[in-house]
Amino acid sequence: MAMLEIRGVRKSFHTYAKPGVRPGIFGRAPKPVSSLDVLRGVDLTVEKGDVVAILGPSGSGKTTLLRCLNFLETADAGTLTFDGEAFDLARADRASIARLRRKTAFVFQNYNLFRNKTALQNVTEGLIVARKMPKNEANAIGMKMLEKVGLADRADYYPRQLSGGQQQRVAIARALASDPEIIYFDEPTSALDPELTGEVLAVMRQLAQEGMTMLVVTHETVSYTHLRAHET
């Protein structure tokens, strides 16, 4: 049985005549003046241990797909089956979403670190706040994850004191801290200078060798050819 299967994922974005007006406001639903079908019945299967790279140009819907899979966007239609449990991507309730997110992690293109927190605090925030883990236990996990990405000596540094590549490695450490079964990567190196890309790819290569399941969206064809990825 596949770890992750998605079937029939659809998502459209609509433009309305009056900015800010959305369906259901003031008692009736306005009709969109234009629509853009971003996802048109996407199907995908990911096996445990796979590294799947979704390649495409900017604006092709790659990031939208990833955000729909983690309920950062609501799809118009589609199902996601994870470890045998099915989720309706258009209608899942909060409890179902929370249950799924405990098994997944998301690495953002622009890191999404808290600017006022240290590297270690960024890694442990979710463990302490969302999972109610004791601080000393969370810190132990956080330091282990920072060591894994080669940044144990930067635990007390703030994002402004780190390079882009280091910030993205902190973001990967944060993802790993939640012990996910799969990590979604949204263009993880596209915001980096070429000389910093290698350090992030090295961490991802290590994770692939350890059997971490990863779904990566990117427009950089060459960068991911050594991650044992199959492309779609």
Task: Give the ranges of each region predicted by the language model.
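Helix-to-loop junction immediately C-terminal to a conserved catalytic motif
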Residues: 70
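Helix N-cap at the start of a conserved alpha-helix in ABC-type nucleotide-binding domains
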Residues: 194-196
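ABC ATPase NBD coupling module
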Residues: 87-105, 135-136
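Conserved small/polar residues in nucleotide/adenosyl-binding loops
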Residues: 189, 225-232
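The feature captures the beta-strand-to-loop junction immediately N-terminal to the Walker
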Residues: 55-57
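Catalytic Walker B motif of ABC-type/P-loop ATPase nucleotide-binding domains
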Residues: 183-186
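Conserved signature/switch motifs of ABC ATPase nucleotide-binding domains
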Residues: 157-160, 178, 210
